[in-house]
Amino acid sequence: MKLDAVTFGESMAMFYANEYGGLHEVSTFSKGLAGAESNVACGLARLGFRMGWMSKVGNDQLGTFILQELKKEGVDVSRVIRSQDENPTGLLLKSKVKEGDPQVTYYRKNSAASTLTTAEYPRDYFQCAGHLHVTGIPPALSAEMKDFTYHVMNDMRNAGKTISFDPNVRPSLWPDQATMVHTINDLAGLADWFFPGIAEGELLTGEKTPEGIADYYLKKGASFVAIKLGKEGAYFKTGTSEGFLEGCRVDRVVDTVGAGDGFAVGVISGILDGLSYKDAVQRGNAIGALQVQAPGDMDGLPTREKLASFLSAQRTVHQKKGDY
């Protein structure tokens, strides 16, 4: 087997409201898939990359649902473990909003994914991939998953694979802020490409500017840092270059969940395609913009054709403004 990239983490069944209002007011829900790492896997698969996702799911119907949905997206799940214990597949409820941030309630404590151990690491499978994508969520789920994350990143790094890391800061999952900051920054030192949001970077480093945040992680060993600035765009820096890329025009923000995953899809795919860091970040901005205009966690993740059409439309807008 040959994979372009592989990732791991917890995917959950998502039940998202069909009506506006608080979760306590809603009567009907639709079912979907949620999970930062699986979002990225699906996004890269839609762009034609051979993707693998590894995890543990419950021996239940929601676990079956997750596997079948990922297979539909073209993501390889051949090494996902079905739990033989009573640990269930995680799930979440998400409200429907007219725009902005929805209310999300998670049910993931003691989930099957949180029990994944280093003894269950399929090294041969991961070594089939040239790139590893990691987020800061798995090490927050349990001591076992924290050890698993360190083990995988060290093994892939020692094998000469490239590693991208999105901190995906979730304070509610960690025992305390100090542990969160230390662990995420420690793991960032094992990555080649690091993708924090500006608020995450400020929290993790104490720096107040994109330049300061980027310098912090370049000194820790990253070769490329891309900092998400929301609707303003993104800033990137390497050892020899830096730049600011304006955000893409968005007609209406429907749901912000998954925007950061879309950015990661764009940047990773761009680098794997051989684009410059600047052009890869611009692609990240574009896919992030597409994602916030769609209701689901990955509904806006495009095919190559849709991405090309969106980028062409963005260039046309800029040309009319005289920006080029």
Swiss-Prot record:
GO MF annotation list: 2-dehydro-3-deoxygluconokinase activity; ATP binding
Induction: Induced by galacturonate and negatively regulated by the KdgR repressor. Is subject to catabolite repression by glucose involving the ccpA gene.
Catalytic activity: 2-dehydro-3-deoxy-D-gluconate + ATP = 2-dehydro-3-deoxy-6-phospho-D-gluconate + ADP + H(+)
Keywords assigned: ATP-binding, Carbohydrate metabolism, Kinase, Nucleotide-binding, Transferase
Pathway annotation: Carbohydrate acid metabolism; 2-dehydro-3-deoxy-D-gluconate degradation; D-glyceraldehyde 3-phosphate and pyruvate from 2-dehydro-3-deoxy-D-gluconate: step 1/2
Primary enzyme class: transferase
Entry EC number(s): 2.7.1.45
Residues annotated to bind ATP: 168-170, 228-233, 258-261
Disulfide bond annotation, renumbered to this chain: none
CDD domains registered for this protein in UniProt: KdgK
Catalytic residues, chain numbering: 261
Gene3D superfamilies, A to Z: 3.40.1190.20
InterPro entries membership: Carb_kinase_PfkB-like (IPR052700), Carboh/pur_kinase_PfkB_CS (IPR002173), PfkB_dom (IPR011611), Ribokinase-like (IPR029056)
Similarity field: Belongs to the carbohydrate kinase PfkB family.
Protein name: 2-dehydro-3-deoxygluconokinase
Phylogenetic placement of the source organism: Bacteria, Bacillati, Bacillota, Bacilli, Bacillales
